Each structure stands twice: as C-alpha cells, then as structure tokens.
C-alpha cells in the first residue's frame, strides 16, 4: 500500500514540476547580423499572456497571435491556449546579442525562461608575429628553430586558426588554441591566439606560411581571412646524386649544364684531370661560365668543351660549389651516346606481357588436356585393325601377302590364328578403357566428364569398325582356292583388301 502511495506522489510531483517548468527552443541561437530567427518558450498548460524582453530593444514586447504592434517582431507559436510564447525576429541586430527573457502568465503567477542569443561579429584580420628573429636581410639560417604567433582579435564567437604552407596543411608543431575575452563599449569580444614552430631546412626557403581564421561569419561570398609570411632561408649548396649528360657530339663544342640549389649565390670551380677552372675563366679547351639564377634558389652552371674528343667522354668532371654557409662537391660524367632508355615499362609493354602470359597458360592447359585424353598429337598414329597393323599402308601390304600365303600353306592353322586375334581384339578395347579410366582418375571432374564422353564415342566407332572388319574377313574366307592360281596377266596371286582408312575395296 505504501508503495502505491509513493508512486502516486511521485507522479503528482513530476506533473507539477512539468507544469511549473518553461522549456525553451533553442537554448542558444548563434546568428549573423541581419539573419531571421524564431525563439520559443513553452509551458504545459494554457497561458494568459506572453511578454518577451530582447537586449537592445527599448520596450518589452507583449505578443499575441491576434495582434502585432511592434514592426519586425511578431508572435510565434501555436497559441496561448497551447501554452506557447514565442517571437519571430525579422532581422537580428548586433545590439540584440545577450539573453532573451520570456514571461508567461499562468493562473495568477508568472513563469519565465531565457534563451542565449549570440549575434556573431566578424573578427579582425589575422596577424602573424615572428618570435624568431631573422637577420638584417630578412633571412634565417638552415637549422634555425622558426617560431611564429597568429592572433585573430575581436571576434564573436572566438575564431578558429589553421596553418598552411603554400596552400597545404603545415603539419608542424602548434600550441593549443588560446582564447582571451575583452569588453569594448559593453560588448564582449574574443581574441584567438596560436603558435607554430619547427626547424628550417632548404626546402622551406621561399615558401609562404599562412595563418587562416575560420569564423561563423564566413560565407561563400565572404571567404576566410588570412595572413601570410614568406620564409627566406640561407643554406649551403644542396647535395645531389652524380649527374650524367648524354647526347654530345664528337668534334663539336660540348655544353655541359648542371642545376644546383644554394642560398646565397654560390661560387663555382671545375676540376678536370687535376686542372682547376674557376667561374668566368678558360683553360685550354675548357670554359667555365658564371652561374645563372633560375629562380627559387636554383642556379644553372655551365662548362663548355671545345672540340669534344672520345677521350673527354671517359673523364670525370668534378664541380665544387661554395658560399658562406659551406661547400658541396658534385661529379659529372658526359657521353656522346643518346640517353639510355628508361627502365620502367610503359602501358603497352605491360599489356603485351599480360597477353603473352595468358596465351602461354592457355597453350599449356590445352597440351595437358590433349595428353590426358589422348587427343590430337597425343592420339594413336593409326586405327588398329583386327590384325594389329601399325599403319594403314603397311596393313594393306601385309594383308595381301598374308592372305595369299595363308590360303596356300596355313590351311586350318589360319582359322585358329584368326580366332586368337578375335579374342585379342575383344580384350584390347577393355584394356584401353581401363587405361583411360586410370587417366581420368588423375584429372579434375570436368576433364573426367569430357574424357568419358570421348570414350563413349570411340567405343561406338570401334564397334562399327569391328563389325565391318568381320564382314571383310568372312568375305576373304569365302574366296575360292582358285584365286591362288597364277594369273595370265601378271603371274601374281590376287587378294581383295579392305582399307581401314577409306571404305573401298582394293586389289593387290
């Protein structure tokens, strides 16, 4: 009983709290100046009146769905009887930033709720401040720890900061974003600060460091604001692999060009067979030119060789480039032959290789199939006859000779031989079939099925050939003995022979 009473009291208390509570939508409204918005306060029962106070407005708005007395502000909601008190603001002003208060009259008392209205203000242009100082000429030396700070002032809400190098994410070490608040003419604004740092390398020279702010007020027509700084780095000539120059003509003046990177401009000297040729000088057939600036800290270095000989192509040309930060040695080889082809394969070559491999695999599969089934080149060289001949032509000759001899000398012995041959012929297809079955056991299921199909066809063909041969043997035995007599034309015995390869009668 006490449990039921407790549940009832809890339900009543919950209902009372629900009625006494004013729900708001949204809790916080983040808007740009000039935006339109709707703010709503709700109660669980019917209300008598709806009053709303908006920062920056001189009077309290008494709103109802039945009238609209203040331009730019109208009632919003399903009606007072539904317990809803809301306002629709046509254009939000910067002075409206703050807390919007709604007051609802309920059965002789007044309930209230608040909504945070944040009107965004675009921050000032970002500023990059260098924490690491360059030299008088604005250069940093290679290996220096570069540090910079980006500040985005007076934004509402605070702006976010991101770093880029040449329009790519910097991916350098940064400090957490720091937000500082300040008040100006009773308006609270925020300033965002972040630092970035890393050790400089030659690749960082002439690159653009960008600090970009991201804010609520950014639009397609109003892109994010940013600040930029060009980093200048001094470094010794950059090492690179040995160079090779191809396509030079013998007995002509050869021009050898090498591109190197350095900051500031390097001094050049060539060493050829122990002889040193400085920039802007000529020594015999060798002339070294002044480095030519190409941009982005790159310089073109040229050596001219008058009357190039075959011996010149066997030499190693040593180049030394130096500036105030260090020196670097390079080795250059030259050749009168054309540039060697690239070792990489093009698309056509790859396709050709794939097709060739596919064809090779297909041929191997066909050979394996033919060998397993005894087809094509792996089949028998002749069709076996009841007398076990090895070839069609030989069988015809042997048939003629054996027939003539058997009719004159063998007599009854020939009959027993024929019976023995008939038994051998009956056993032969069975043995062949067993051999084929043994082969089929070693094959996959699909190959075994194909093999059985071929065996059935071969068995039917063999039976037909056997019946035809039996008829031929019967005909030969019925030939009278007078056929063994000597003919007056050629004085040789005659025999009628059935050719197994072609179904015709021939005379021997």
Swiss-Prot record:
Pfam families xrefs: C2-set_2
Domain Ig-like C2-type positions: 126-223, 236-310
Effects seen without this gene: RNAi-mediated knockdown in the neurons of adult males, significantly reduces survival to 57 percent. Adult survival begins to decrease from approximately day 14 post eclosion. Pan-neuronal or glutamatergic neuron-specific RNAi-mediated knockdown decreases adult climbing behavior. Glutamatergic neuron-specific RNAi-mediated knockdown also decreases activity throughout the day (during both light and dark cycles).
Phosphoserine PTM positions: 382, 459
Sequence segments annotated as region (Disordered): 381-439
Residues the record marks as carrying a glycan: 160, 257, 300
TM stretches of this protein: 347-370
Pyrrolidone carboxylic acid, modified sites: 21
SUPFAM superfamilies: Immunoglobulin
Keywords: Cell adhesion, Developmental protein, Differentiation, Disulfide bond, Glycoprotein, Immunoglobulin domain, Membrane, Neurogenesis, Phosphoprotein, Pyrrolidone carboxylic acid, Repeat, Signal, Transmembrane, Transmembrane helix
Topology feature Cytoplasmic, residues: 371-508
One GO term of the biological process aspect: axon guidance
UniProt topology in membrane: Single-pass type I membrane protein
Stretches with biased composition (Low complexity): 400-409, 425-437
Domain Ig-like V-type residue range list: 44-106
GO cellular component, as recorded: adherens junction; neuromuscular junction; plasma membrane; recycling endosome; smooth septate junction
UniProt cross-references to InterPro entries, sorted A to Z: CD80_C2-set (IPR013162), Ig-like_dom (IPR007110), Ig-like_dom_sf (IPR036179), Ig-like_fold (IPR013783), Nectin/Nectin-like (IPR051427)
Disulfide bond annotation, renumbered to this chain: 150-211
Database matches in PANTHER family: FASCICLIN-3, NECTIN-RELATED
The name this protein goes by in its record: Fasciclin-3
Organism expressing this protein natively: Drosophila melanogaster
Primary gene name: Fas3
């Amino acid at each position: 009983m006490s449990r039921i009473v407790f549940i009832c009291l809890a339900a009543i208390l919950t209902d009372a709290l629900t009625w006494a509570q004013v729900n708001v939508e949204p809790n916080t409204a983040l808007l740009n100046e000039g935006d339109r918005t709707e703010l709503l306060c709700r109660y669980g029962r019917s209300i008598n009146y709806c009053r709303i106070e908006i920062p920056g407005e001189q009077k309290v708005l008494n709103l109802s769905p039945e009238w609209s007395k203040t331009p730019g502000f109208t009632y919003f909601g399903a009606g007072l009887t539904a317990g809803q008190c809301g306002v629709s603001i046509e254009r939000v002003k910067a002075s409206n930033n703050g807390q919007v208060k709604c007051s609802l009259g309920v059965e002789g008392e007044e309930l209230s709720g608040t909504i945070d209205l944040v009107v965004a203000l675009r921050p000032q242009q970002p500023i990059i401040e260098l924490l690491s100082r360059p030299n008088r000429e604005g250069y940093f030396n290679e290996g220096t720890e570069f540090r910079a700070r980006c500040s985005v002032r007076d934004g509402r809400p605070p702006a976010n900061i991101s770093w880029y190098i040449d329009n790519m994410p910097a991916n350098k070490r940064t400090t957490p974003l720091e937000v500082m608040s300040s008040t100006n003419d009773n308006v609270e604004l925020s300033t965002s600060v972040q630092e970035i740092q890393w050790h400089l390398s030659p690749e960082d020279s002439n690159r653009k460091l960008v600090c970009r702010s991201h804010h609520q007020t950014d639009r397609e027509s109003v892109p994010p604001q940013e600040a930029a700084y060009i980093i200048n780095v001094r470094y010794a000539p950059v090492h690179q692999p040995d160079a090779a120059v191809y396509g030079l003509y013998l007995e002509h003046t050869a021009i050898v060009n090498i591109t190197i990177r350095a900051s500031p401009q390097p001094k050049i000297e060539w060493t050829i067979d122990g002889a040193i040729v400085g920039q802007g000088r000529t020594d015999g057939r060798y002339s070294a030119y002044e480095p030519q600036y190409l941009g982005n800290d790159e310089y073109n270095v040229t050596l001219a060789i008058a009357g190039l000989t075959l011996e010149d192509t066997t030499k190693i040309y040593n180049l030394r480039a130096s500036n105030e930060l260090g020196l670097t040695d390079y080795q250059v080889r030259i050749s009168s032959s054309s540039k060697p082809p690239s070792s990489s394969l093009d698309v056509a070559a790859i396709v050709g290789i794939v097709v060739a491999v596919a064809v090779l695999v297909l041929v191997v599969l066909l050979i394996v199939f033919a060998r397993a089934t005894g087809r094509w080149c792996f089949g028998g060289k002749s069709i076996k006859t009841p007398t076990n001949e090895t070839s069609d032509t030989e069988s015809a000759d042997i048939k003629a000779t054996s027939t003539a001899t058997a009719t004159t000398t063998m007599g009854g012995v020939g009959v027993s031989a024929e019976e023995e041959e008939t038994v051998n012929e009956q056993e032969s297809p069975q043995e062949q079939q067993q051999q084929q079955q043994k082969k089929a056991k070693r094959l996959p299921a699909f190959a075994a099925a194909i093999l059985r199909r071929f065996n059935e066809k071969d068995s039917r063909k063999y039976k037909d050939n056997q019946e035809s041969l039996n008829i031929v043997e019967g005909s030969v035995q019925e030939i009278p003995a007078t056929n063994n007599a000597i003919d007056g034309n050629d004085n040789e015995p005659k025999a009628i022979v059935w050719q197994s390869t072609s179904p015709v009668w021939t005379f021997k």
